């Protein structure tokens, strides 16, 4: 017996699959793994469910996967609810075309003291450190990362994103949605290359592609189990995209943009850190100068098409700093910035989660 084993529903991929049918025995281990999982689920469920139902006096279903996953969510939500925001104060000086910040202080009076001590004093540049850094292109989307991005950019729930993506899949405009891989298989390289050429010529954000795409970076068949990463299909070139519902159009544009970004060039910039001294107190200013926009230019053009409310605030550390030299002096103007501690770090995924992409973010 031979099996048709494909990771894409495109006509070319299906034809190639039928031309390269694989022996059924190659997949016996998948069956055996499924039997092991089913047995483990049954053993945990039949024993733990009976135990905890007796202990609590009501039926309480316990599972091998859902119960520990739910426990992680409950634990993290409890940490978020218990978090208390605390204000802190940062003395700042403005001089030489930049704003430099001191240390975070819990007491406003301490920040006021530093500001007063800096009044009428001269600020001098202690050091100027420059370092060339790179930001590698992002990976292609799997279902989880796409759902996260759609929620952050458009506010769509995970189910909405899946519904839109499923509809695109049924219209043959996107590849299989329920995938956990962020790579393509080797047989998809030619399709991806032709698709990228069309996106570069026909999508507004495609104009940011100035170099040859690096498809090898997103190709690794060993990291594809059942289905490869989510990308558009070549059917997009024969479809009136304006006729699609807005949600489907948003999701399709996002995965198209990610394909161009993932195969784009590395983003290179020069990070600049300036340390100043004023009245014996140290102040730091950070900025950067872009040397090669790379894939971030594609992302920038994509975000230009979003509504203003959907654009993220620019980080002051991303702005370019004026040219400064060690020993340069200025007459600064002082002030105090008041901010609150946030819970953004608490909303990161737990280090106990086994997913590789989550562990990288923690």
Annotate each language-model stretch with its function.
Residues 1-361:
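Toprim catalytic domain recognition across nucleic-acid enzymes
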């Amino acid at each position: 017996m031979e099996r048709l084993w494909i990771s894409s529903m495109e006509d070319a991929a299906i034809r190639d699959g039928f031309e390269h049918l694989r022996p059924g025995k190659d997949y016996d281990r998948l069956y055996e793994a499924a039997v092991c999982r089913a047995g483990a689920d049954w053993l945990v469920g039949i024993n733990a469910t009976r135990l905890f139902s007796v202990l609590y006096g009501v039926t309480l279903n316990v599972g091998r996967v859902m119960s520990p996953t739910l426990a992680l969510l409950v634990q993290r939500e409890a940490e978020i609810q218990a978090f208390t925001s605390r204000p802190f104060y940062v003395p700042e000086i403005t001089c030489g075309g930049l704003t430099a910040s001191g240390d975070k202080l819990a007491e406003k009076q301490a920040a006021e003291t530093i500001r007063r001590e800096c009044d009428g004093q001269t600020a001098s540049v202690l050091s100027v450190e420059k370092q060339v850094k790179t930001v590698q292109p992002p990976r292609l989307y799997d279902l989880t990362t796409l759902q996260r991005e759609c929620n952050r950019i458009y506010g769509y729930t995970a189910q909405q994103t899946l519904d839109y993506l499923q509809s695109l899949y049924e219209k043959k405009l996107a590849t299989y949605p329920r995938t956990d891989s962020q790579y393509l298989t080797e047989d998809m390289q030619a399709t991806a290359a032709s698709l990228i050429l069309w996106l570069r010529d026909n999508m507004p954000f495609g104009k940011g592609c100035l170099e040859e795409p690096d498809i090898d970076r997103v190709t690794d068949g060993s990291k594809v189990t059942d289905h490869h990463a989510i990308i558009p299909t070549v059917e997009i070139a024969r479809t009136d995209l304006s006729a699609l519902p807005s949600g489907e159009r948003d999701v399709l544009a996002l995965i198209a943009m990610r394909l161009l970004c993932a195969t784009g060039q590395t983003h290179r910039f020069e990070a600049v850190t300036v340390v100043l001294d004023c009245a014996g107190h140290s102040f730091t200013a950070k900025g950067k100068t872009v040397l090669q926009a790379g894939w971030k230019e594609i992302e920038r053009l994509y975000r230009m098409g979003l509504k203003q409310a959907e654009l993220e605030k620019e980080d002051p550390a991303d702005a370019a700093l004026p040219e400064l030299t060690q020993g340069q002096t200025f007459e600064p103007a002082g002030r105090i910035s008041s901010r609150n501690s946030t819970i953004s770090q608490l909303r990161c995924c737990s280090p106990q989660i086994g997913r590789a992409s989550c562990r990288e973010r923690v």
